[in-house]
From Swiss-Prot:
Subcellular compartments: Cell membrane
Pfam family, any one: Carboxyl_trans
Gene3D superfamilies in the record: 2-enoyl-CoA Hydratase, Chain A, domain 1
Keyword terms, alphabetized: Cell membrane, Ion transport, Membrane, Sodium, Sodium transport, Translocase, Transport
Catalysed conversion reaction: (S)-methylmalonyl-CoA + Na(+)(in) + H(+)(out) = propanoyl-CoA + Na(+)(out) + CO2
Originating organism: Veillonella parvula
Domain CoA carboxyltransferase C-terminal: from-to ranges: 267-503
Protein name: Methylmalonyl-CoA decarboxylase subunit alpha
Primary location: membrane
GO molecular function, a single term: propionyl-CoA carboxylase activity
Amino acid sequence: MATVQEKIELLHEKLAKVKAGGGEKRVEKQHAQGKMTARERLAKLFDDNSFVELDQFVKHRCVNFGQEKKELPGEGVVTGYGTIDGRLVYAFAQDFTVEGGSLGEMHAAKIVKVQRLAMKMGAPIVGINDSGGARIQEAVDALAGYGKIFFENTNASGVIPQISVIMGPCAGGAVYSPALTDFIYMVKNTSQMFITGPAVIKSVTGEEVTAEDLGGAMAHNSVSGVAHFAAENEDDCIAQIRYLLGFLPSNNMEDAPLVDTGDDPTREDESLNSLLPDNSNMPYDMKDVIAATVDNGEYYEVQPFYATNIITCFARFDGQSVGIIANQPKVMAGCLDINASDKSSRFIRFCDAFNIPIVNFVDVPGFLPGTNQEWGGIIRHGAKMLYAYSEATVPKITVITRKAYGGSYLAMCSQDLGADQVYAWPTSEIAVMGPAGAANIIFKKDEDKDAKTAKYVEEFATPYKAAERGFVDVVIEPKQTRPAVINALAMLASKRENRAPKKHGNIPL
């Protein structure tokens, strides 16, 4: 009979075997590719010595194709919980050194367990994906595992923040778990996501494409819009995840952490008074407006490489987290198009789900014209913005800096779509269409058309007609934007808005 000490030594041996993953050679190969192991990634993600691993000794039950002879340490996935900046977070990290991180029945069961724990505790979950896909030997059991993970992703949506991290291959059905989460991080040159890989595409369509061009970090950050962030390397990626979590609440019943940023809430920035060109058709950088108004000029852009005609980012005003949606006049004059509508709508809905106030900076001349846009469904996609803003019950503040024309003005959270406070700069032009274009229609047959057009532009290319009708709450100097927004946020802190009871709405997807 073994002694107590021998039993303790046996535990240490078993733990060492699990922590060794797929063995020294496979770990070396992982490092040679510029990738950390699953446990190294989790150690970087969590506060020092805070990570608690669960289910180290779980084993697969497959007896087909010689699998019964295989020992797969930890079932190829590390799961557990710890703290990030002192706050509880759950995580899983697939271990590519063990059977390529392939997903089988018990691998999936470990992931589902931490998903459910995260829901019970009201804590965010981070999933690090690095897997060759389904464990083929386990057949339908592996497929069922994916289905259970997808179900938990959907169940947790809007309740706890879910962050997916792609740090290697993520192919086939595996891609849908990240797609169901709130944010996806990818690492340049080492991350790939695709449903069918280059070899299958070549055999079916004849197209030749590399894995990086097909599903690499920049393909999904700038072309498809599937991913939200692209990191230079794994260290950078993990640092960004920790930074993002600082802007978010732990769950939908809490508020985001209030941070003492040290920036004066009454600060005015004189540079804003001279930022806009005198010619309203000339571009400027809306990021300069954001940087001049938020705490310490610091903001974290979401999808910075996708649909760059609109900016979505997290920032703080007087220490309070906000989500910012802003037109970018430097790109396509700030017009809304299909991709910009999708990008902003999803961001609006995330902010609303997690009690994060929304601040809008508006300079929008209209929806982008063109057959590609019309045939691509700009009506349906643009309607998503109208729906998302109308549905949102968090504080909504709109700052109109210049153009606000037609349906695009409404789509950028006008008072009619539920904006709680609308501020306008003196440079604002709020109208059904551009004043010059409107005048050309109204005075088309008049002999003194030019004089009447000039007078019309002078009278209507201002915020004052809208203010006279109550569509603008306050006309402010540009430099007053920061204190105005902070005052509005303080006033709206106790906002409560009730809607008609329903199972759920039918957003125009």
